[in-house]
Structure formats: C-alpha cells, structure tokens
C-alpha cells in the first residue's frame, strides 16, 4: 500500500520550528507535559535525550500506568490482577527514582505534582524516601487516593513547613503533625482535602505560619486529638477566601470541630455541613464581606452558633442560604444585601 502524504518523513532542509529552538525553551515547553511524557521525548534524537532533565515542573501520576496496562491487555481497570497491580506500582516507583536521580537540579523545580493511588508498596516507598520537595518549589499538589480508607496515610515531611518560596499548597489525604515552628512566608493558597491533623495545635501552627495567606480550604479534614469542648483558634489577618466543608473531630461523622478565627479582611465565605465558626474581630459584622454561602447540611448545628454566625456575616452583599438554614427561622438585619439566593 502506498504511503500517504500524512506519514511522509520531512525532507532534509525543511524547517523544524521546534527543533530549531534553544534547549532552554524546549525544556520549558516539556515542563507543561506530565513527566512520563516529557521523559518519553528522550527517544526522539541524541539532542533530545537529556532535555527533559531540565524541566521546571515534575508531574507524577500513576494512573497513567493504569492506562498503559489497560490498553496493552484490552482489559477493564477493575479486572487487573493483584500481580498486575503490584507490577504497576513497581514500574511507577522505578520511574520516579529514575527522574529524581537524573534530573539536573531538583532545587530548580518550581511545581511538584504527585497524584497516586496508595498501596502498601507505595506507602513503604514513601515512608522510606519521603516526598522530595526542592527548596525553591512554588507549588505543591499532592493527592494520595484511597489513603484514609486503606489506613495508609503519609506523614508530611518536616521540610514542607519551612519552604520559603511556596505559594500554593494543595494536599489530599495526608497526615499533618507539626512538632516545630512553621514558616511559610510566601504561601497564599492552602487547600486541604481529607487531611488528618494530629491535634489542633498542629493545624493552628500550620495556618498561622502563613502570614500572607489569602485562600484557605478545609474539606472533610479531621482533627485526631480533639473533643467537642475544644476550640481551634487561628489568626489570619490577610485571609480573603474561606471554604469549610464538614470539618470533623476524632473521625466522628457527627462531631464538628469548633473554630474561632480572626479574619478581618474576609471577602468570600462558603460553609457546607459546618457552622461551628466564630469570627474574632473588633467590628461585627465582618466589614469586608462580599459573599456568603451557608448550608448547615445533615449534621446538627447548635442554635446559638448559627445565630452568632448569621449575625457576623450579615454585612454580605450577596448571600446564598439553603432550606435547612431557613427552617431555623433566625435572621438578623441584612442591611447591605443586594442579592439573595435560596436553595
């Protein structure tokens, strides 16, 4: 069969715009690919062999190995055998080791993304090696899928709490135990999903150790050493965006943590399955609040805490209230309200 023009090899002399670029530019372009594919470009030519070793972003995802196994066997993911499952993890961890050992300068990495489905082999590796954060990293995105269900949570390394250039941290299903001081002077965005905090002091130190924090998200986080009479106190003068969803104590699905927070510059508030929040500020209601969304959810909230909360957010210009909040039949004067949505 004759080869179509689509598959013709370019003739010598025809410009290759990508290859003509400087090595630094090509490495920068490769930084936007998942690391698995960036490393794969090494087979293109002798010149491309080491270009990936200068990428400024490392993006690991063992689900890409799932896809390779599935496509090679034309099999369903849920039918992978235990042997294949272990082989997948071994291949992935060897790949991670190869990247760490061959990268030219890990301290030059600006973005570190690590998304994996946790297994026993994965936990053993991470407990032994830890997560390698370069000292100059600016963004960290760690997701350990199924870690809590499998009881295989990974402890955050001590080095995480003193990363001077870190601006964005997104952590999913890890364990945070803060034994020393926290100094994250550049962190502006902190998002925690299903994070296990050893105690309220650990979480309080983490939050207050971010002097310019603007966005905080706590979703289904759990404080392991806290009872219903304890209060988590945090001062975040720079905070502008706050999201709290089902913040629990002692892994008890019915026991909500209580939070007292100083956030005088707060502009946007989203609460779901959580209303045990009190703002500590000299002026009440919150002076800078633009929007508030409150859903008491299926977990019971105390009448007093909800009354106090609604009074403190009554300065919002836009508000969304859910029916389960309305049935409490307690509303302060909403003197700045321009828009109200009832869901």
Model regions and ranges:
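A structural signal for leucine-rich repeat
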Residues: 127-131, 155-163, 180-188, 203-212, ...
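Right-handed parallel beta-helix
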Residues: 194, 214-215, 240-243, 267-268
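Leucine-rich repeat
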Residues: 2-6, 11-233
């Amino acid at each position: 069969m004759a080869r179509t023009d689509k598959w013709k090899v370019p003739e010598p002399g025809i410009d290759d715009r990508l290859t003509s670029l400087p090595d630094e530019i090509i490495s920068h372009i490769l930084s936007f690919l998942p690391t698995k594919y960036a490393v794969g470009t090494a087979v293109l030519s002798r010149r491309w062999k080491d270009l990936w070793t200068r990428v400024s972003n490392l993006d690991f995802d063992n689900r890409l190995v799932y896809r390779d196994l599935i496509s090679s066997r034309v099999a369903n993911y849920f039918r992978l055998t235990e042997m294949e499952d272990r082989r997948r993890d071994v291949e992935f961890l060897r790949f991670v080791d190869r990247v760490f050992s061959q990268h030219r300068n890990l301290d030059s990495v600006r973005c570190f993304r690590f998304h994996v489905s946790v297994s026993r082999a994965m936990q053993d590796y991470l407990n032994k090696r830890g997560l390698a954060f370069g000292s100059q990293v600016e963004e960290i995105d760690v997701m350990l899928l199924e870690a809590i269900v499998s009881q295989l949570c990974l402890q955050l390394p001590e080095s995480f709490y003193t990363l001077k250039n870190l601006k964005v941290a997104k952590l999913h299903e890890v364990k945070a135990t803060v034994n020393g001081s926290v100094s994250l002077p550049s962190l502006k965005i902190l998002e925690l999903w299903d994070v296990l905090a050893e105690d309220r002091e650990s979480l309080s130190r983490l939050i207050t150790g971010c002097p310019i924090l603007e966005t905080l998200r706590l979703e289904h986080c759990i404080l392991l050493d806290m009872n219903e009479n304890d209060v988590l106190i945090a001062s975040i003068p720079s905070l502008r965006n706050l999201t709290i969803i089902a913040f629990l104590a002692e892994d008890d699905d019915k026991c909500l943590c209580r939070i007292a927070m100083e956030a005088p510059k707060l502009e946007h508030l989203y609460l779901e399955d959580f209303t045990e929040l009190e703002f500590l500020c000299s002026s009440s209601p919150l002076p800078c609040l633009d929007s508030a969304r409150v859903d008491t959810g299926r977990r019971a909230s105390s009448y007093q805490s909800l009354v106090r909360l609604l009074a403190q957010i009554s300065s919002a210009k836009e508000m969304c209230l859910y029916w389960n909040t309305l049935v409490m039949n307690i509303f302060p004067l909403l003197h700045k309200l321009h828009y109200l949505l009832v869901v």
